Amino acid sequence: MKTLQDYIDKLNSLNFKEMYNNDFFWTWDKTDDELEAVFTVADALRFMRENNISTKVFESGLGISIFRDNSTRTRFSFASACNLLGLEVQDLDEKKSQIAHGETVRETANMVSFMADVIGIRDDMYIGKGHAYQKEFMEAVTEGNKDGILEQRPTLVNLQCDVDHPTQCMADMLHIIHEFGGVENLKGKKIAMTWAYSPSYGKPLSVPQGVIGLMTRFGMDVVLAHPEGYDVMPEVEEIAKKNAEKNGGSFTKTNDMAEAFKDADIVYPKSWAPFAAMEKRTDLYAEGDFDGIDKLEKELLAQNAQHKDWACTEELNEKQQKTEKLFTCTACRLILQV
């Protein structure tokens, strides 16, 4: 059994100095040591809580949350994390703030950052907008700190944008590491990141993109499966390919769910919207073309309905040769093993 000193020794062996006074936008922005440091701290905090050791780091301070899209699990996870470390959470509701009266991002960012140690932002609805907003927000905060308006520069944590969902994907990755007994046991394991039918049409691409962008860094054989037309961002696919080449695993694509499931050690069913359609939706909203948006929604719902057979079923699972698989169901945030 590990001790707290074991985790401290592990952290001392890693180089993560650049994370200080920096932000967490995407996992592929971080080095291997930096990702391992995050996993190590997470394990250390769990050890401390389970052994009744205080995890309080701050005597006071704020954790600011800004959710520009609906959230349950991430909202409560962020609040729980802040509480665990000694921060009080303040949630900024843009509809109830001066933003609704035309206040700029620069003004808002600096105002809410007084006494803040961390800012968590979710902005995942529109392609090309979410990550850009997070960057603009933190550029304003950085400038405010340099100009002496803010005594300190809070850190941003991406709570999901249009490109990546790092907090969820890293939580899933750490669970997989635990399940297989360590990072060293992941090489050669097959994970199928598969599209699955949902009656709604507009789910973000950031989860499948986050999964292929992170899990290809661990020597795993990562398969991205979806019906024709449900592609993700090509630049994230390129990142996944480069990760696989560098780390000895593989990254492949298929339009056959059963093929993706075959011999998989882990399957990750998740619905998402087609990248091209989400780009079009963003343009329609920018133009104020609500008739066009309504038409697009009907087209996408009809397109989704053609793929109801893309479902994680007992029948599909029974066709596979392996007797054990790890299922990650993000719709319910449950981890099931069969």
Give, region by region, the residue ranges found by the protein language model.
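Phosphate/diphosphate ligand-binding glycine-rich loop within oxidoreductases
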Residues: 56-177
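Peripheral docking tails and interdomain loops at the edges
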Residues: 154-194, 324-338
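Charged helix-capping and loop-helix junction motifs
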Residues: 103-107, 205-210, 284, 309-312
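Glycine-rich phosphate/diphosphate-binding loop of Rossmann-like nucleotide-binding domains
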Residues: 68-80, 177-283, 287-290
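Glycine/Thr-rich phosphate-binding loops of Rossmann-like dinucleotide-binding domains
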Residues: 128-130, 201-202, 276-277, 336-337
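Positively charged, low-complexity intrinsically disordered leader regions
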Residues: 1-76, 80
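Glycine-rich phosphate/nucleotide-binding loop
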Residues: 270-338
